[in-house]
Amino acid sequence: MLRSEKSVAVEDIVNIYKESPSVIITHYHGLTVSQVSSLRESLKSQEAGFKVVKNTLAKIAANQTGLNNIVELFAGPTAIAYSKEPVGMAKLVVNFAKANDNLKIIGGVVDNHVLDKHSIKELSKLPLLNELRGKIVELLQAPATKVLGVLQAPSSSMARVIQAHASKN
């Protein structure tokens, strides 16, 4: 690889680190091209990506972006999964790793916090951001409907009492 190609590759990885608050570092040794393509396609549906990286270049990019904590994770045949939404990407990568023993999760970074492989597996168990938003809206709407029911109850009870009294007379 020429020096100019290396600098372009480092710049590309630096952009990934800067634009994606979540990165999962994996070893992909033994995956077929079709398996890697399948993983890339499923990640693309979550607006995420998967890139095979050269360890020395990934380390240089990590040092340039202040991610010095992850440098030691780059050893062996390494690829990174990256996304702006960490939970959806973690779910896809963890599920793919369960189905394909040749993909090993090494660690990662979410919002500049270094995670080990166990933390990434726990992250994958969390609900997606859109699911959380839906639950919050649901929780906010529930008290309003209960208050409305309580406010309507006395008036409907009063109407029934008046109706009963009117039917007696």
From Swiss-Prot:
Record keywords: Ribonucleoprotein, Ribosomal protein, RNA-binding, rRNA-binding
Pfam families assigned: Ribosomal_L10
Gene3D superfamilies: 3.30.70.1730, 6.10.250.290
Domain of life: Bacteria
Example GO BP: translation
Claim: Transferase is one of the keywords in the record: no
Gene Ontology cellular-component terms listed: large ribosomal subunit
GO molecular function: large ribosomal subunit rRNA binding; structural constituent of ribosome
CDD domains cross-referenced by the UniProt entry: Ribosomal_L10 (cd05797)
Entry function: Forms part of the ribosomal stalk, playing a central role in the interaction of the ribosome with GTP-bound translation factors.
NCBIfam families from the UniProt entry: PRK00099.1-1 (NF000955)
HAMAP family tied to this protein: Ribosomal_uL10
Subunit structure, as described in the record: Part of the ribosomal stalk of the 50S ribosomal subunit. The N-terminus interacts with L11 and the large rRNA to form the base of the stalk. The C-terminus forms an elongated spine to which L12 dimers bind in a sequential fashion forming a multimeric L10(L12)X complex.
Family according to the record: Belongs to the universal ribosomal protein uL10 family.
Protein name (Swiss-Prot/TrEMBL): Large ribosomal subunit protein uL10
Organism encoding this protein: Rickettsia canadensis (strain McKiel)
Gene from which the chain derives: rplJ
